[in-house]
Amino acid sequence: MNAPLRVGFIGLGNMGAPMAQRLLAWPGGLTVCDTRPEAVRPFAEAGAAVADSVAGVAEEADVVCVAVLDDAQVRAVVTELSSAAAPGTVIAVHSTIADRTAEELAVTCAERGLELLDAPISGGAPGAKLGRLAVMVGGSAAAFERVREPFGCFADLVVHAGEVGSGTRMKLARNLLHFVAFTAATEAQRLAEAAGLDITTLGKIVRHSDAVTGGPGAIMLRDRTAPIEPDDFWLSILRHVRDLGEKDLGLALELGDRLDLDLPLARVALERLGPGLGVGAGDKTLERHNS
């Protein structure tokens, strides 16, 4: 039976620290590194090895997790790792960077016999503390299999998105939804506020109902975005979603008009909900266009 992989972790910030804390129990051992002594101290006290440099982590790890701020920091860390790591080492970048950055760094690493994975995460610091992150991994299938078990310390969903860069592309698509939804939430707050409602109560309603329905992810079950064929199982279901959505969006827009409040995202949603679901615009949208 093979010995457990030795794991290194570079970057003990808001996300990196709780992820690394979950790895303290990893049987292969954990070596950590951060430029801030106060970030490293709790790990040393908990029994982790501490390296005083990125190269020092490379010398002690078979898999190195990187959770630093941005593309520039990732490039600097990976450059130092690639000069010190033994062939066969896997470098997993958890930072959200440009997919092209991941592709470029993977080529550089491959020239030195190393494998780079882009492995961004979703779930935030609370998810990391609970071991409930989702990790989207781009890279070879063999490298993915090597990291799957240690990643399981801080994630309960680890997916192989495809080749290097695919993990980042999936994260960007996921976060597009996240921040468009945040923007829509601010529009909903403005409508509620203009109508004289308590927007903190609206927030409670949204969090309660999303916990039950699953939020936007509840409709993300098809394996393609093309228009739905007449005999497709999803046709009647998503037409029903469209009809409900168009009715409620239309009512919200009418309320906004009465309050002299512009709701640009709601207008776009009314126009694009049906086509986006693959079922075309419904009667409510067509009526509004023709009125």
Language-model regions, residue ranges each:
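Helical "substrate-binding/catalytic lid" subdomain
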Residues: 167-258, 272-290
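Rossmann-fold NAD(P) dinucleotide-binding segment
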Residues: 54-115
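NAD(P)+-binding Rossmann beta1-loop-alpha1 motif at the extreme N-terminus of oxidoreductases
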Residues: 1-66, 88-90
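Hydrophobic beta-strand scaffold residues
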Residues: 30, 50, 115-117, 158, ...
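Rossmann-fold dinucleotide-binding core
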Residues: 7, 96-175
